[in-house]
Amino acid sequence: MNVGTAHSEVNPNTRVMNSRGIWLSYVLAIGLLHVVLLSIPFVSVPVVWTLTNLIHNTGMYIFLHTVKGTPFETPDQGKARLLTHWEQMDYGVQFTASRKFLTITPIVLYFLTSFYTKYDQIHFVLNTVSLMSVLIPKLPQLHGVRIFGINKY
């Protein structure tokens, strides 16, 4: 019996990225972050693009690949307790529309950032390292893998 819950999913984390309008909201949030950073005086456009990319990728890494469990009281008897949000998404099925969207978004942002920074070497290295830090954990081969035991518990 689910006392105090109003959802029909066993774990709402599995379907949250399939909610209506979530993709548009996500893209608008990235755009809003960029506009807010652009409004800071004396900061150049290349630095703003790099900051947008770094903040986005840091947030994505933290929320999708380090935070584990679910904020809800779920009747799954703790099965989601040791899984990151990325591993819970779409019940662990690989290559769904939501997973593809969340994989392509940092790549598109990386291309935009590289273009607007005019492929400056320092910006390019920072943005490439940032992109790899969010793309590598998304690989299907790393589903449930904890490298060196980091984030195991």
UniProtKB/Swiss-Prot annotation:
Reported modifications of this chain: When hydroxylated at Pro-137, ubiquitinated via 'Lys-48'-linkage, leading to proteasomal degradation. In endothelial cells, ORMDL3 proteasomal degradation is controlled by the sphingosine 1-phosphate receptor signaling pathway.
Segments traversing the membrane: 22-42, 43-63, 95-117, 122-142
Subunit structure: Ceramide-sensitive subunit of the serine palmitoyltransferase (SPT) complex, which is also composed of SPTLC1, SPTLC2/3 and SPTSSA/B.
PANTHER family documented for this protein: ORMDL PROTEINS (PTHR12665)
Domain of life: Eukaryota
Record carries keyword Phosphoprotein: no
Similarity field: Belongs to the ORM family.
Region span, Important for ceramide level-sensing: 1-17
Ranges of the Cytoplasmic topological domain: 1-21, 64-94, 143-153
Ubl conjugation in keyword set: yes
Membrane topology, record value: Multi-pass membrane protein
GO biological process annotation, one example: regulation of ceramide biosynthetic process
Keyword line: Endoplasmic reticulum, Hydroxylation, Membrane, Transmembrane, Transmembrane helix, Ubl conjugation
Role summary: Plays an essential role in the homeostatic regulation of sphingolipid de novo biosynthesis by modulating the activity of the serine palmitoyltransferase (SPT) in response to ceramide levels. When complexed to SPT, the binding of ceramides to its N-terminus stabilizes a conformation that block SPT substrate entry, hence preventing SPT catalytic activity. Through this mechanism, maintains ceramide levels at sufficient concentrations for the production of complex sphingolipids, but which prevents the accumulation of ceramides to levels that trigger apoptosis.
Gene Ontology CC terms, in alphabetical order: endoplasmic reticulum; endoplasmic reticulum membrane; serine palmitoyltransferase complex
Domains (record comment): Ceramides bind to ORMDL3 N-terminus and stabilize it in a conformation that physically restricts the accessibility of the substrates to their binding sites in the serine palmitoyltransferase (SPT) complex, hence inhibiting SPT catalytic activity. In the absence of ceramides, the N-terminus is flexible and permits substrate binding, thus liberating SPT from inhibition.
Protein name as it appears in the record: ORM1-like protein 3
Residue spans, topological domain Extracellular: 118-121
InterPro entries, A to Z: ORMDL
A matching Pfam family: ORMDL
UniProt subcellular location: Endoplasmic reticulum membrane
Modified residue annotations for Hydroxyproline: P137
